């Protein structure tokens, strides 16, 4: 009985196996065939760089036929640099010229002949979205400011220094008066660099030095000493950058009253950062410290291994500092990134570094914007402030100055990422022209993808509608807190950090909702 049962089970199993196997074999063959002869949707693509305008019809045909032979589905046409930047290659097709558009037209027709598709970037070069049609007013904007110390108690009629202006473009946002207790200039210090290398045959001059431009460099343990004639109260340390240098933000701060006995103040911690980190300096807040001697110790030991923070100073630790500035006024820890002036992620400011007494309350700050009248840089402030010393903070915005740097004939300022009109203007003057300057019928068949590549245009933290968008999205008015964008603490450390986080959230949302969303909408309408 058991033997018969086993035979029946075996027979049923064999029958089931023979029923399934052909399907499995057929499916396996199908997958293999699909891999060897993929559908158009599954075919790989490649980048097609047109370098320095060195492109010809013969070269276009050869390239595209090779792509077809290799089984590619298409290619992203991307011109890089112009004919003048690669003069040794004798390029003839400068971007935006009739010669260049003829090459684009020919490449589309050849791709159409071969059954290939094309994609193009949103601008000349590979980063990110700019061109010569973008004016400073239409470009990415940042908040800038200047400050002036005045005495209150009497009528003033003064002109204030204009903040930074890129290509003479600047617009005011607001003018504030903030009370200050001590308006004395920062004290001058004697600066000494000392080698701490233990290797006997290494001379100090070989390990730490200050060059003719004042840049301090070292590959070995060292310290930088600031010596003051009188005790100086330091609340923050501004590191002036000389290119990306992660090591400059790993200093251990020590202080002394006599130059012999030193006490620990703080170990500076670098912010998380991208490789494009040089638009702004980096300010580290410290507990208020009064001393005559400040030392900044550095050692390559303990450096974080190389990671997404693309800085060669992690792989080969070298200290490079253009300048250290010690300030007596309170500032939020690494406020430059928190204000959206540069992309960084830093530790929150601690209350022992910036206390409640160091933060301006809204009631202390006087808004003088309406009393500041005139045009451009000939505006005059007419006002009477209460007695005492006041800092006049003139805040405005200008272009960041970032361009699509890898471009050639189409190089220009990066468009305002918060303004749908400038995003459309960018699209209309580049990608849309690929249809207008060629055969539109062929272009619609071939040019099927719009490519938005590497974000290499720094940051943006303002435009004319930013305050309106902020209030709509966050539910409160940013304008009374505008000094926060200059690193000035307001209300409390917790409140300051929260508002700046809201600023960054608004920046992020506008980039997505305006820049990318608008490009997606108008891109779909074309391809």
Go through each PLM region and give its residues.
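Bacterial Sec-dependent N-terminal signal peptides
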Residues: 1-27
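Carboxylate/His-rich catalytic cores and anion/metal-binding grooves
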Residues: 250, 447-482
């Amino acid at each position: 009985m058991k033997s018969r049962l086993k035979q029946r089970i075996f027979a049923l199993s064999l029958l089931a196996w023979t029923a399934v196997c052909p399907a499995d074999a057929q499916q396996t063959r199908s997958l293999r065939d699909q891999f060897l002869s993929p559908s158009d949707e599954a075919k790989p693509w490649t980048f097609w760089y047109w370098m320095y305008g060195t492109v010809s019809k013969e070269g276009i045909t050869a390239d595209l036929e090779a792509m077809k032979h290799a089984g590619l589905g298409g290619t992203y046409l991307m011109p890089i640099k112009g004919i003048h930047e690669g003069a040794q290659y004798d390029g003839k097709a400068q971007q935006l010229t009739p010669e260049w558009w003829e090459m684009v037209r020919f490449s589309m027709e050849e791709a159409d002949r071969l059954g290939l598709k094309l994609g193009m970037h949103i601008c000349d070069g590979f980063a990110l979205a700019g061109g010569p049609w973008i004016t400073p007013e239409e470009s990415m904007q940042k908040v800038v400011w200047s400050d002036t110390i005045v005495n209150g108690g009497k009528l003033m009629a003064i002109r204030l220094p204009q903040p930074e202006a890129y290509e003479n473009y600047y617009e005011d946002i607001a003018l504030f008066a903030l009370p200050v207790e001590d308006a004395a200039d920062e004290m001058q210090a004697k600066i000494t660099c000392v080698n701490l290398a233990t290797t006997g045959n290494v001379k100090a001059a070989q390990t730490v030095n200050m060059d003719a431009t004042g840049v301090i460099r070292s590959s070995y343990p060292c310290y930088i000493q600031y010596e003051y004639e009188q005790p100086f109260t330091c609340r923050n340390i501004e590191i002036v950058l000389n290119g990306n240098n992660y090591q400059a933000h790993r200093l251990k701060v020590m202080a002394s009253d006599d130059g012999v006995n030193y006490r620990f103040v703080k170990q500076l911690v670098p912010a998380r950062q991208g490789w494009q980190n040089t638009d702004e300096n980096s300010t580290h807040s410290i507990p208020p410290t009064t001393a005559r001697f400040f030392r900044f110790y550095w050692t390559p030991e303990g450096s974080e291994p190389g990671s997404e923070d693309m800085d060669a100073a992690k792989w080969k630790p070298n200290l490079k500092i253009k300048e250290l500035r010690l300030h007596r006024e309170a500032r939020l820890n690494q406020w430059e990134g928190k204000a959206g002036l540069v992309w960084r992620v830093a530790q929150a400011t601690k209350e022992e570094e910036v206390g409640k007494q160091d933060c301006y309350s809204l009631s202390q700050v006087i808004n003088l914007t309406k009393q500041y009248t005139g045009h451009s840089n000939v505006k005059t402030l007419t006002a009477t402030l209460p007695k005492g010393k006041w800092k006049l903070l003139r805040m405005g915005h200008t272009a960041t100055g970032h361009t699509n740097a890898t471009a050639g004939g189409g190089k220009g300022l990066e468009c305002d990422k918060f303004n749908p009109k400038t995003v459309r203007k960018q699209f209309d003057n580049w990608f849309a022209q690929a249809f207008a300057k060629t055969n539109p019928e062929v272009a619609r068949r071939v040019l099927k993808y719009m490519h938005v590549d590497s974000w290499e245009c720094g940051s943006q933290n303002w435009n004319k509608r930013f305050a309106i968008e902020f209030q709509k999205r966050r539910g409160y008015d940013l304008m009374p807190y505008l000094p926060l964008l200059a690193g000035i603490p307001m209300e409390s450390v917790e409140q300051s950090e929260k508002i700046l986080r809201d600023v960054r959230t608004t920046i992020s949302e506008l980039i997505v909702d305006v820049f990318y969303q608008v490009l997606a909408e108008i891109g779909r309408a074309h391809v």
